[in-house]
Amino acid sequence: MMWKTVLITIFAAGVLADDFSQITAVVTSQCTKNNAEDKVPEVEAALRTFGNCLKGLVDLNVLKTEIEEAKPNGALDEVFKKYCDKSAQLKGCISSVLQGVRPCVGNEYANHINDAQNSTNQLIDFVCYKDGDRIALFIAEGGPECFQQKTENLKTCFLNLKQSFPTVESANNLSLVEKCAKVDEMTSCIVKSLEECSTPTPANMAESLIKFMRKDSPCHTALPKTD
């Protein structure tokens, strides 16, 4: 499901960029692959609606300006409270687009759409805990800069996981415990990379998020962790 979620993210990025020409080609290809050519207009409409929904919730340029203006005044929490108050609407946007692309993701992945929705809801809840205190602290402590500095290291972490699952067939041949172990290796790699930054907050935040999301995943019972 991971790569299908990435695909949806790419769709969304195109929608937000107001460049639908590239999305049309990808949607057509994906729908054709799953014998759902007739669903192309329906999926495109869902993606357009998703893009408009997101634009109605946040203007990224405005948000960036608000963050920069709030940093010197220590008012980041006020900025994120305003946006976290819209989290229920954001969850609705995501739910709608996940259901909207269902006809073109194939039966194997369609069965995991609810899991994807639960995961994104958990992510939103984590980020917006206490009206966004976590994300405010993350930015105030140089989190984005840390991620930027460690981009290549993080890419390596993801690439190592991808090489463990080069094909759908190879992934299916692994047991759940084996899959969870591979994912745990990747997340440990991420945290270790971020620990090299000048402040501990980015690594601590990433580790907390990973633990938070793992707790409600099949890996929590299949491969329990004591720490």
From Swiss-Prot:
UniProt keyword annotations, A-Z: Glycoprotein, Secreted, Signal
GO cellular component: extracellular region
Domain of life the protein comes from: Eukaryota
Record's subcellular location: Secreted
Glycosylation (residues): 118, 173
Signal peptide interval: 1-17
Expression by tissue: Expressed in the subesophageal body, fat bodies, hemocytes, midgut and Malpighian tubules. Not expressed in silk glands.
Keyword Signal: yes
Membrane spanning stretches: none
Predominant location category: secreted
Pfam families: DUF1397 (PF07165)
Family designation: Belongs to the UPF0408 family.
PANTHER family: EG:BACR42I17.2 PROTEIN-RELATED
Protein name stated in the entry: 27 kDa glycoprotein
